[in-house]
Amino acid sequence: MINHGKNIKIFTGNSYPSLAEEIADIIGVQVGDSRVGKFSNGETAVDINETVRGTDLFLIQTLCEPVNDSIMELLIMLDAFKRASAGRITAVIPNYAYARQDRKAKARQPITAKLMADLIHTAGADRVLTMDLHAPQIQGFFDIPVDHLEGVPILAKYFINQNSNTDDLIVVSPDIGGVKRTRKFAEKLHAPIAIIDKRRPKPNVSEVMSIIGDVKGKKAILVDDMIDTAGSIVNAAEALVKMGAKEVSACCTHGVLSGPAIERLENSPLKEVVILNTIPIEGDKRIDKIKVLSVAPIFAEAIRRIYEDMPVSKIFQEE
């Protein structure tokens, strides 16, 4: 797939090696030879077992459970590649951790999303490739280029293929903050939108206040960037059914699915939950209601474009 004067290398940490291998396979290269383990005291140990001098290097490491271990692996590997004289280092981070801590919601709180950006840059990244940041303005926390991919085209294409007649569809934003994403999704389906007005009295707890829009007799599709404990999405689905929606599905980019999420989804009125695999969804999380779509093709195409110095934004124009 790639034919260029520079030498490309793809490496991965331990957070999601199967995704890195899928991306590398599409590009037509092998994942680089490295070992990431632990010293006896729990510190992260990294060995890079091949030369990377002068290469265009892409380190694929999503930031998922155990989150802080994933972060330390990323930072230490970036440092190793920088000290080994890699020509250009792109940190490929499908899911960017601490993205919800992007501002001071109350006094004396940290802005950890900014701290993360500083750490990644200082460790050695020359560029970042990520997908659906919880707050897009996090791109401005970096002093290096950030290529920000969107999950909406992949998710919308799935629902278009599943619904030959989109006349009875309505796309629903689970909160005011997600309206822009929901509108993009709805435009692809040529469907109207509705908005759920909710309040969040404390973290991971939400209450539906009202629904803006007519969902009666419609097939509703809830669109979010992330499903964590699934409280918000399940509350929204229950409210939509109560308001007369004949069917409710949900989709998101990042399936964190922590704590009671799986049990809540199982017991919810949701017909289907479509999730992109920016985070591994394995074992007990692979319930019948959950449909997982791969992000490997879009990341492979973005890596190809970065490597060949082509515009990444054209990916979305070609969708």
Swiss-Prot record:
Mg(2+) 1 binds at residue 134. It is an enzyme of class 2 (transferase). Its EC number is 2.7.6.1. GO terms for biological process: 5-phosphoribose 1-diphosphate biosynthetic process; purine nucleotide biosynthetic process; ribonucleoside monophosphate biosynthetic process. Pathway: Metabolic intermediate biosynthesis; 5-phospho-alpha-D-ribose 1-diphosphate biosynthesis; 5-phospho-alpha-D-ribose 1-diphosphate from D-ribose 5-phosphate (route I): step 1/1. D-ribose 5-phosphate binds at residues 200, 224, 228-232. The keyword Ubl conjugation does not apply. Its cofactor is Mg(2+). Belongs to the ribose-phosphate pyrophosphokinase family. Class I subfamily. Homohexamer. This is Ribose-phosphate pyrophosphokinase. It comes from Clostridium acetobutylicum (strain ATCC 824 / DSM 792 / JCM 1419 / IAM 19013 / LMG 5710 / NBRC 13948 / NRRL B-527 / VKM B-1787 / 2291 / W). The lineage of its organism: Bacteria, Bacillati, Bacillota, Clostridia, Eubacteriales.
